[in-house]
């Protein structure tokens, strides 16, 4: 008989490691599992410790958050460990973040953190502790199939859904992970935290880039990859120089504000050319892309991705975390994959993720995804014809 986590055995005989960041979500996750009788072990990762960040509202995995996680664990009466992952985090996440901006991309550090720190290194530690599962406070859900494997689905709370940031989770990792908050709303989580008497019940949510102490990501870029802040030209689609900029890392595709140039009509960043330090701008209609080339594709749709695609697989894709899934076709084989957007999308930026879903809304299944490498404005009439790239990473 399976318990509430779809695992064999009674809760009291089932050890679960909970990744505790010190926030309300992971704290409530630990409290829920403890209340259900599981053998809960809390682990908090020390990822960075900028002096300015440790007491900032919304900081994560440093300073005050570690103390909050320790206090919650003490109240729940569960073992709690703090692991120093600063070196791993710097190498896998912060350096990657800076490199991506230097290439003219707009990275999503949370994806890399989940992929390389939480769901690889921490998962390994959980296994070494004899845990049958690793639970997190993410707003996403998983469902058990008849064969025992699991599928990733969107959270019940669409406003909090974090599936975009978890597309790179492997099937092996997914089978070991549990997301107890996936069918709850944020207000319900906070109310539960109050019932459990957790001091973090009304704590502010974490920020998008937890390791940026001042809120200015360019400070990190300037320190780690100063060449990304070298000045260069702002040009139009025909290459005419319209002005100068103070570093491509200050811009992202689709940006309108802060260009510092005068024009009769609104201009937007269409692409960033890192090799020659050029920011290319154009009218809004130049932003719409219809074809996306992907790298590092992760498939969660079951079976072999090439077999699933065949001559083309219809799906829905999200090209930014704040966007709604849009109809698209996935094509390709042998590690080379492209997305054809039925209606096109604006602001498609290299470095962002393109996440696959089987439905446009509700608790849709996550089929995987990849990182955007380049994009083109029009779909070629001949599939074998090379892309004329409009956006290049």
From Swiss-Prot:
It catalyses: S-sulfanyl-L-cysteinyl-[protein] + uridine(34) in tRNA + AH2 + ATP = 2-thiouridine(34) in tRNA + L-cysteinyl-[protein] + A + AMP + diphosphate + H(+). Pfam families: tRNA_Me_trans, tRNA_Me_trans_C, tRNA_Me_trans_M. Keywords: ATP-binding, Cytoplasm, Disulfide bond, Nucleotide-binding, RNA-binding, Transferase, tRNA processing, tRNA-binding. The active site is at 113 (nucleophile), 210 (cysteine persulfide intermediate). Signal peptide: none annotated. GO terms for cellular component: cytoplasm. Catalyzes the 2-thiolation of uridine at the wobble position (U34) of tRNA, leading to the formation of s(2)U34. This is tRNA-specific 2-thiouridylase MnmA. It comes from Bradyrhizobium diazoefficiens (strain JCM 10833 / BCRC 13528 / IAM 13628 / NBRC 14792 / USDA 110). The lineage of its organism: Bacteria, Pseudomonadati, Pseudomonadota, Alphaproteobacteria, Hyphomicrobiales.
């Amino acid at each position: 008989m399976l318990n509430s986590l779809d695992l064999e055995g009674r809760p009291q005989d089932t050890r679960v490691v909970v990744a505790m960041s010190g926030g309300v979500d992971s704290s409530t996750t630990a409290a829920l599992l403890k209340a259900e009788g599981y053998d809960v072990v809390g682990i908090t990762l020390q990822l960075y410790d900028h002096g300015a960040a440790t007491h900032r509202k919304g900081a994560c995995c440093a300073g005050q958050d570690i103390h909050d996680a320790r206090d919650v664990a003490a109240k729940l009466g569960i073992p709690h460990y703090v692991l120093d992952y600063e070196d791993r985090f710097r190498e896998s996440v912060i350096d990657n973040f800076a490199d991506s901006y230097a290439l003219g991309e707009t990275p999503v550090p949370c994806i890399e953190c989940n992929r390389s720190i939480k769901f690889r290194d921490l998962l390994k530690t959980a296994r070494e502790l004899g845990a049958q599962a690793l639970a997190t406070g993410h707003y996403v859900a998983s469902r058990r199939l008849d064969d025992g494997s699991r599928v990733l689905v969107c959270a019940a709370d669409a406003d909090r859904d974090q599936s975009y940031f978890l597309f790179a989770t492997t099937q092996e990792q997914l089978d070991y992970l549990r997301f107890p908050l996936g069918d709850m709303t944020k207000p319900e989580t906070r109310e539960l935290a109050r019932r459990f008497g957790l001091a973090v019940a009304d704590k502010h949510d974490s920020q998008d880039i937890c390791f940026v102490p001042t809120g200015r990501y360019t400070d990190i870029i300037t320190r780690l990859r100063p060449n990304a802040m070298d000045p260069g030209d702002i040009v139009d689609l025909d290459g005419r120089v319209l002005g100068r900029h103070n570093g491509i890392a200050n811009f992202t595709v689709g940006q309108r504000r802060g260009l510092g140039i005068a024009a009769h009509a609104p201009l937007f960043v269409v692409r960033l050319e890192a090799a020659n330090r050029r920011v290319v701008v154009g009218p809004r209609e130049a932003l719409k892309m219809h074809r996306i080339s992907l790298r590092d594709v992760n498939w969660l749709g079951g079976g072999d991705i090439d077999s699933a695609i065949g001559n083309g697989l219809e799906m829905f894709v999200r090209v930014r975390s704040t966007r709604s899934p849009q109809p698209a076709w996935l094509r390709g084989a042998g590690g080379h994959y492209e997305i054809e957007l039925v209606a096109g999308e604006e602001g498609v930026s290299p470095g962002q993720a393109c996440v696959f879903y089987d439905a446009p809304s509700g608790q849709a299944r996550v089929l995987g995804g990849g990182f955007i490498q380049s994009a083109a404005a029009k779909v070629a009439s001949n599939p074998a014809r090379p892309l004329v790239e409009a956006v290049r990473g």
